[in-house]
Amino acid sequence: VIAEGQQAPPPWLETLDGDAPILLIAPHGGYAEPETAALLAPRVNDLHTADITRELAIRLDAAALINTAMDRNRLDCNRLDEVVAHAPWLLTMIADRLEQMVAEHGRALVLAVHGWNLVEARVDIGVGLTKRAGRLVPSRGAHVSVSDQFLTGTLNVLIDRLGRAGIVSTFGLRYPAGGAQNLMQVFTQRHSASSIDALRRITALSGRGAIEAVQLELSIALRFPGSLRDAAIEALSEILANGGDGAMRNGNHSHRSHRTAGAPTIHLPRSAPRKSARFGLEFYDPALRIGAMASFDLGVGRGGGRFMILRTDGSVLLFTGERGSDRESAALRVGPLRLRTDGGRLRLEFVGPALLTPDAATYVNIERALSQSSLETEVTFTIDFTLGTSLDVESVRAGAEGEGASGIPVRFGNFSGRMRIGGRDHSMSGVARIGPAFTALDDAAFDARRRLWAFADTDAGAIQANEFFVDARWHPGSGSDRCRIIACEPPAIHASLTAIRDEDQTVVGQVVSHIPLVRSDSRGRRFRTSIGFADFAIERHRYFGMFETSWRVDNRPSTSDSEAETG
């Protein structure tokens, strides 16, 4: 990648000088090369982190090493093994700058700016720690990259300051920065016995207690241009000024240490969850031809929630968030997305940011989709569901935690509500399905799948079809309602509905909107998927609903722990 003996930094690395004892690094600020587009599941570059790092460097008067163009699929500047093999000069450059800072100031702060492709306004702080049972502990053999004083002082004050701006902070929730090859571990004693001179120089500074090193994983809401990004930069600039001196001016340091803090109050069920499932709500307005999907992860393990809105102009609106540690009675909440039982009905509410992508077809390549997207900072909706049979949040939660997806009943009905996107209000109504998330892959024990649901607001009721391709043939799944799918690909869907006494009826669906995806099941197997909404016709009846088709594709093996650690 880099010529041996090269003295000047390569064109893709922007270097900035500063007088403060701060070194900023943007390891993944580049973009995908044309060759990367041929990969089925390339690692996504951290869009906008180069610009954010540059702005922070100017405001903090900090030095900076900014990757502005190198594709992380060619050279991952956050992986020590790749840097040693292909860009060892980068470690020397880091060591030189840190030694100079420590000589002048007696200390240095290293701040690595990364991107987390979650939409919710969140930052995950990586210092080699993760939270277990309310306590911060080192993750999988990690060395902690900050001192106790910096952890309980500066970082606590930063978390409070971000919280006042509406930004949620966590320690190592997804990215603890504890992997052996993670760049943050360079600034600890983990590699003190290395034969590499630059590494020994850096660890010598660390051994003197002269370095504090922090990895910041900024969500989409904090990276894409908008008020939340401005608020995050303002908070970081204020608290981390002069290497963290801003915290002394802004904090009272009355916080309990995160290493010893007790667990937060959690209203647990009588018995701990045994299983998990994704609970989904899908709804479609046939007049506006707008379809939406929302879902919540329930039960064991970490999870989150999300919604996706598909429109006939080909655009898609997306929100994703992380599930918190607390739970609310008669409600499910993931950040600003909330589902609650209200007077015998289910009400879905949201006020917050969402990612707007003008062309849903770009989602076959996540980085391309993100590069064409913008942030809608204020999306709001309130949707009420009226079902044929009542359903409440607590019964759904209990079913998912006790039996998994099979413990969640399926209900069809109607919805009504209001939605505001981009300053435009929509009054909505139409058909809805509630139950196990229609599109969830879970542990996909099939090579392909095709399914549909359709509902008519008449006595005609609902139809469902669910088929799996196993052992070279299609097999009907449970809940297929005598409906067999013939073809399930945009722009049209064809199926056959077997009547009880009459001849088979033809089901024809015209696709209104859809999105192609590449996604993984719980075992890491890759699938290509097409999901969307359609208008259906069965003889004289009009139905409205959804379809999905997924098939397994080959993929290169994923790296072991690097994906979770390189950020």
Predicted regions and their residues:
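N-terminal catalytic or cofactor-binding beta/alpha core of small enzyme domains
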Residues: 1-251
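Structured soluble/peripheral alpha/beta segments that form catalytic or ligand/cofactor-binding pockets
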Residues: 253-567
